[in-house]
A protein has these predicted regions:
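Conserved beta-strand-loop surface patch within small alpha/beta domains used
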Residues: 1-128, 137-223
Length: 223
């Protein structure tokens, strides 16, 4: 158990979000097919590039018997006009040196050091916005161990977790609510960042595209 420690490595002050416009016009919203009668209010909206989505899914499918995972990097942002906090996830970092099995995943100290060094060296302008891992044949949910990892490794209110189930082609984000509470029973969808006339890459069966007045029909193609 000596290698299963939590490191509190120094990082720049990233509590202040980047001021920028929320890219709703350049994204397609994917929502869970089944939602609560009174939907939860997440602290942040998640925007994910197609490249980041593909890399996370590809890594998730690399081992269909054991859990795999890693970190998600990008930007924590705020749109003052819309009064919305949101994340831009554009970088996926697969974790090396993990302690993993069919029903568990642990980021070891070596894994954390390697990921922090890689992030600092190659992506110094980006922030650690969350983590992802798989639940092979178990569904999209947040276990008590997942909750412990999230609380201790990703304590900032705006950091999120993505769970991928590679066998059933499903996935979802776990996001703290505006009151700071993380409901481990409920997952959220995300906004897929899409270039004009580019087809959607999302194929998770538990999510469906949702269009609203902020999404121009000419900007996205769903297959």
């Amino acid at each position: 158990m000596d290698n299963k420690i939590v490191l509190h490595l120094p990082q720049e002050d990233d509590t202040v979000p980047h001021q920028t416009r929320i890219p709703t016009h350049h994204a397609l919203q994917w929502s869970p097919r089944y939602t609560l009668e009174e939907p939860l209010k997440p602290l942040v909206k998640v925007f994910m590039t197609q490249n980041a989505y593909i890399r996370a899914v590809a890594h998730g499918g690399s081992d269909l018997d054991n859990e795999v995972g890693g970190w998600m990097a990008g930007k924590y942002c705020y749109d003052q006009e819309a009064q919305e906090y949101f994340l831009i996830i554009d970088t996926i970092l697969a974790a090396p040196y993990t302690d993993q099995g069919a029903a568990h995943l642990t980021f070891t100290s070596d894994s954390q050091i390697a990921l922090f060094d890689f992030l600092e060296h190659y992506y110094p302008e980006k922030q650690l916005v969350g983590w992802y891992h798989t639940h092979p044949r178990m569904g999209v949910f947040f276990s008590s161990w997942d909750e412990w990892l999230h609380k201790n490794f990703f304590p900032k209110p705006w950091q999120v977790a993505l769970v991928i189930e590679p066998h059933s082609s499903t996935g979802g984000f776990f996001i703290r609510q505006k009151n700071g509470v993380l409901d481990t029973r409920v997952y959220f969808g995300f906004h897929e960042l899409i270039n004009k006339n580019t087809q959607s890459k999302v194929f998770w069966k538990n999510l469906e595209p949702k269009r609203d007045m902020n999404t121009r029909e000419t900007e996205v193609l769903v297959v």
